Amino acid sequence: MSRYQAALLGLGLLLMFLLYMGLPGPPKQTSQLGRGPNVTVLTGLTRGSSQIFYREVLPLQQTHRAEVVFLHGKAFNSHTWEQLGTLQLLSKRGYRAVAVDLPGFGNSAPSKEVSTESGRVELLEGVLRDLQLQNTVLVSPSLSGSYALPFLMQSHHQLCGFVPIAPTSTRNYAQEQFQAVKTPTLILYGELDHTLARESLQQLRHLPNHSVVKLHNAGHACYLHKPEAFHLALLAFLDHLP
């Protein structure tokens, strides 16, 4: 190769490099959901013999919307919903939201009173009463189904919405019991959850007023694997409640 050809080749490579550097890169994938003013997360303990630790956010704008209560799974606690940004997001969207530590988890002491189904129902009723929660939507993942399902069966008149996320304890109730519950329900589960999600979905489908959202490429804790998709589905459900 002559010096002239080598020079032309070098010039061509330089021009290609400069052109490449000037091209715009791929757009950053940022979420619009969490933007806005900062939100203060309050903490406290309920009254009574079984004191329950909770985290709470108030709506940044005064609304008359539903109030959302978050339970949690076996490996989690109320802090999960703060870390995920769920509490803060709902506050910005005009919702009051409360996340509780179930007995024996997080900052709540163990309690013998929740060893029975009736005791677990009474505990949730006490939380709603102590915190003066009304028009409540109950969000129940995994293990917390042992609290949420008996509460739904016995006290569904206290709920304006129910969001089960592959909960336990669905087998404890007959098809007719589910059919008697008219509470609007959003059934959420992860596509990759091949055990509890399928089992619970079989039973929860008997609820007469339900919709189903499957989060793709998400496992049992689908809200952790696909938080933005989870938040979008939850907000769409809440925003359309009467």
Swiss-Prot record:
Keywords: Cytoplasm, Glycoprotein, Hydrolase, Membrane, Signal-anchor, Transmembrane, Transmembrane helix. The chain crosses the membrane at residues 6-26. It is found in: Cytoplasm; Membrane. Pfam families: Abhydrolase_6 (PF12697). SUPFAM superfamilies: alpha/beta-Hydrolases. The active site is at 142 (charge relay system), 193 (charge relay system), 220 (charge relay system). One of its GO terms (molecular function) is hydrolase activity. Coiled coil: none annotated. Its EC number is 3.-.-.-. This is Protein ABHD14A. The lineage of its organism: Eukaryota, Metazoa, Chordata, Craniata, Vertebrata. The gene is Abhd14a.
